[in-house]
């Protein structure tokens, strides 16, 4: 009996304390809503100070953080040391033109084909394997989240998304994206799917300043673009990224989806019953940063139901701005509480068992890609 009591006490004492918003200040809760970035390759005093004072919930890796394999792993290890063990550390790794892991110079990641090639092959087992490779290599550097897969549907020849999309056929997108998703999460990596509610039909790139329009009715959107999101919501996806395109036939204005309560709250939350974390595409992208004030972006997005922001321009500045808006009544503090709780709950679920594995750039994975996608052999030699 004494032994059982001792073991129970030992396990309780050694279990890492879970995060909770109960003892967080307003500023700390706002900090959870930020996914920050620093273009450096080692965690310096300025970053340490920012992590400890502002307590951001996430960090997005850029090419500047991914210089060499060992330095990258050390950088991410230090992020956890100063930002919290289960800080959300995410990286863009779609394949094709968007794969940050290939920036690592001294140890080459497996080069992933673009989504269009994956859709053209349309082999579910291959798509799962690709997701598995992505998840394994993301976890190998120590990160725990990836912006993949892309769920947008459209013709690559006319869409601003190009070959980042799997197909213009919704069924091909659904089946292959679902397998990529499963391969990623089977490595204990969070899959952040994008770009809700679908930007495949826009010809304007939201990175630029021009307003990006999708001229679809809700019925048209529901029958096509929303179907991959519905599929993955039913499969338990934990994070959905909302894009910056506008849907005037649905919202009756040109407000970007990322700032629209109709898109985020009415459709994603209430209609589709998504209960995870809602993230929006980077706040420094031209479509919103050049057309809305910084204050308007955060106030409108939070009031719409957005939980997390990528690439804020200075953590303290943004926390100050949001805190002031809460205190003035422009943002209900309950919206902050809801966001912080969703993010904290996600962080508490993150598993560390596969993190920092040694399965980065394995020759067997590169050979697999070569066998299935011959044009990509040159990158995987």
Please tell me what each predicted stretch does.
Residues 1-53, 270-271, 291-381:
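Preference for extracellular/luminal or secreted protein segments
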Residues 52-176, 195, 200-215, 243-259, ...:
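Enzymes and membrane/adaptor proteins characterized by extended Gly/Ser/Thr/Asp/Glu-rich
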Residues 183-193, 224-237:
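Phosphate/pyrophosphate-binding betaalpha-module
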Residues 265-278, 282:
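Catalytic PLP-binding core of fold-type I/II PLP enzymes
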């Amino acid at each position: 009996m004494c032994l059982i009591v001792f073991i129970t006490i030992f396990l309780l004492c050694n279990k890492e304390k879970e995060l909770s918003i109960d003892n967080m200040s307003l500023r700390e809760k706002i900090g959870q809503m930020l996914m920050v970035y620093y273009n450096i390759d080692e965690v310096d005093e300025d970053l340490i100070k920012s992590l400890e004072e502002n307590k951001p919930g996430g960090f997005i890796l850029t090419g500047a953080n991914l210089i060499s394999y060992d330095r990258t792993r050390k950088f991410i290890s230090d992020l956890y040391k100063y930002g919290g063990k289960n800080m959300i550390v995410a990286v863009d790794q779609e394949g094709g033109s968007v794969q940050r892991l290939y920036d690592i110079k001294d140890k080459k990641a497996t080069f992933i084909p673009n989504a269009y090639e994956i859709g053209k092959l349309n082999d579910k087992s291959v798509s799962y394997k690709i997701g598995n490779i992505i998840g394994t290599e993301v976890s190998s550097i120590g990160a725990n989240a990836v912006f993949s897969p892309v769920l947008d549907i459209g013709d690559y020849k006319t869409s601003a998304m190009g070959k980042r999309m799997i197909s213009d056929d919704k069924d091909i997108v659904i089946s292959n994206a679902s397998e990529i998703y499963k391969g990623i999460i089977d490595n204990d990596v969070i899959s952040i799917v994008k770009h809700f509610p679908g930007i495949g039909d826009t010809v304007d790139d939201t990175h630029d300043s021009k307003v990006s329009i999708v001229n679809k009715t809700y019925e048209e959107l529901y029958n096509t673009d929303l179907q991959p999101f519905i599929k993955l919501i039913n499969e338990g996806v934990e994070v959905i990224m909302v894009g910056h395109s506008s849907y005037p036939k649905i919202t009756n204005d040109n407000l970007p989806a990322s700032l629209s309560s109709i898109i985020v709250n009415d459709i994603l939350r209430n209609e589709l019953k998504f209960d995870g974390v809602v993230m929006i595409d980077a706040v420094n992208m031209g479509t919103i940063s050049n057309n809305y004030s910084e204050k308007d972006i955060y106030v409108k997005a939070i009031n719409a139901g957005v939980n997390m922001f990528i690439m804020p321009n200075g953590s303290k500045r943004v926390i100050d701005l949001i805190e002031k808006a809460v205190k003035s009544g422009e943002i209900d503090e309950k919206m902050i509480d809801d966001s912080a709780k969703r993010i904290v709950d996600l962080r508490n679920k993150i598993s560390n068992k596969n993190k920092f594995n040694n399965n980065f750039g394995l020759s067997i994975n590169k050979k697999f890609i070569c066998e299935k996608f011959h044009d990509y052999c040159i990158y995987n030699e």
